[in-house]
């Protein structure tokens, strides 16, 4: 038996479909897209992937499609997995993985790629997968975009990213001549969709013992040979074939997984599959991009698979106007609801509304909730020969099991289980919140009066105040209750005419930051947030702090591309700038023209500006590969001397554009090229003394000298990491993080007026340590929770509900799991050594 389990489907915070195929013995395969949030969905649903060995990527490979893959690979490696194969139909895959070389590094896992030609078959003892590569505009399949030399370079880089043995304790990929290499140029965007046919090895028929004995076969080794499908000859010369003593083989239905990115692919798909042999086809999964129109043209293609097989094929459709916008992360949503019951104006109810395809739902007579928004693509009803019972909506709970059947004797066995459950905030409130008996928390106050309320920047008073949204507040990797870190700070500015202009600044953006924004806000509010987004700041290169930035940049461009005067400042360690350039050349070059990049190092509060290393040119890298290992290890990269000169002109322009008085960084005590920062904003054009200073620690040990007493001193707001509880000081020292008390100590020495503590270890996912902390000298402080919206003027209001917070999470504590905070190769080495000792 084989089970197909949807891991994600198109929702606000999981944009694409991902399918897990699992055998009866536990072998696992992924098919589809590894979008941001995929790993968190596995955690939410307690799905283990220790037996995962193959990932078959479908469709195109934009960041939206595979933004969750880097984090997924890191986690799989940290779990001790020794091998993983990525399958795809174009060698752009190696380029993609190579772009991650400055921030994805794990030893002990053998990561391989398998570039599949059109109609090539990959086979193991369980499964056979045939690829179908469809070019956007038709034509002959072009397997690759690189020549043999370039392919060799890319493969070498990927191999060095995943070495067999651990490097020295201090390792900087940007100083490794095998990683800091110029990547090959891309001439054009790769527009190919990879699709798959899945078939399973048949089940051998039962051995008919009595029949074998009748034929004179003695018990023993000859029975075994016949069972294995071997023909035997008896002593009397009689030949006995397996067919004489075995029941008929049992087969499984075939499955197609088709990924159509947009309407321009449709004709090529029709051409590719018009003569497809539908015999034994039991299910077709359609992974439809947002730009695919639900109309007759689409269903004319789908009808192809009904020919000579009418009524026998099931069709499972994934599309953002068909699949429900269900809550993907219920644990997180329930946490938000409980916190909202305590501070109703500090949280938005997660959005579950969606505009559905009226064409689809009318044609297949599928019910929707009252008041659902719908849209039509054509005037006439959908024209298709598919019956209602054979069309299915792809969603997280819609599992399919395939069981073996005897061909020509019984029908294919394809069992579809699971329906979308009705979702009601009111019912969830009654079940999980009402029993807590919070004062003033009733269903009208928390739910009914808040269904369409946006609590961010929603009053005349708030429009004049600094506001903070702690989008993600966890460390290392996404958990059930906290996503990885990201903070949005809105700083208003009053111009000479008294008009208020917002400056939104994003401080770090871990994986699926955009998904959180989409779940929190309406489309109109999202547009406003991104039109006001002026800067993205990245503190360091650990993946949990930046895997969401590309999605944020794409979303910013979506709402600002028509305004040619609009730019976004991106302030990051220099290596991340290289990644952005390499990635956006692949996906959307136009965004690069609208990014103004400045290195974190150019804001350093020091006379010494550290130089970045120069990348090795491709031609020179070829010579390095020919050298022996001793020569390789002794080779040093050259420094880029120009990089030590601050980009003063661009910094001045940023100061002017964003009305900034000072922007300073200091080196964080964490990993190489890690920073803390302080930004002083002007607040009123008519009052030069009206300023607001915000400081952000990033990840660091307490840095009193440089951060508290120098760049951050007298901050109006300090946002500081508080990764570990106070009793875990030894862990904090080892991992170069802060305990809660240490973070408070930094604030006290800084003389910060207000303090927000964030970036909590996922070992304590719901509630940080509220008591036994040292005194906070700041006027007000609070602990950050995911999706929390807080007015700077009211940061201290959370302290009033501290006594109720422990009560709020009694239910969750009963099922709490201890998740290790693994951030570095050294953490993994320690774990492996302990394991060997045991």
From Swiss-Prot:
The keyword Signal does not apply. Its cofactor is Zn(2+). It catalyses: Endonucleolytic cleavage of RNA, removing extra 3' nucleotides from tRNA precursor, generating 3' termini of tRNAs. A 3'-hydroxy group is left at the tRNA terminus and a 5'-phosphoryl group is left at the trailer molecule. One of its GO terms (biological process) is mitochondrial tRNA 3'-end processing. The modification Phosphoserine is found at residue 824. It holds the Pfam family Lactamase_B_4. Its main location: cytoplasm. It comes from the Eukaryota. Belongs to the RNase Z family. Homodimer. Present with 2710 molecules/cell in log phase SD medium. This is Ribonuclease Z. It comes from Saccharomyces cerevisiae (strain ATCC 204508 / S288c).
